[in-house]
């Protein structure tokens, strides 16, 4: 029988392996995603972010890093988590169905050149899929954070979008990588804005 200590140690070991596997395929796309967001922000655009459950928390975490700060003081950056307005979420969900809670907000707030960050560990979340469709209708760019094989979202992205797919089967490890990717993108954005990299 495995002890609790061994279980915890196994989580650390698996998390390290998952990050090492992700590093092999995600460094360049992460830079591309950060550059896409920088281009948007420097052209007075905004970033909209969405996801469900833990991915909703990641969307909010990302928006907070942008509007507040990541690690260094800098100007505020326009980012909105579409997961936080309970009145909008419940009204849209009640009147149109849960699949449309993000897409209706994307159509209301998104403009050409803006960026949607859609987060789904499976790549198959119906309301994130609808948000991606709405973003494309608005001529927005999409950065998709997914896992496993990327799901339906990976298949619907355009050449001008960026896929950050964590090639790992376990949801917890995908989520840990998603927050790492979010922090890495925030760092890239800050390094360009503050240090001119």
From Swiss-Prot:
Residues where Zn(2+) binds: 61, 65, 175, 183
Catalytic EC class: isomerase
Pfam families: SIS_2
Gene Ontology terms: cellular component: cytoplasm
Name the record gives this protein: Phosphoheptose isomerase
Family, similarity comment: Belongs to the SIS family. GmhA subfamily.
InterPro entries, per database record: GmhA/DiaA, Phosphoheptose_Isoase, SIS_dom, SIS_dom_sf, SIS_GmhA/DiaA_subfam
This protein's UniProt keywords: Carbohydrate metabolism, Cytoplasm, Isomerase, Metal-binding, Zinc
Originating organism: Neisseria meningitidis serogroup C (strain 053442)
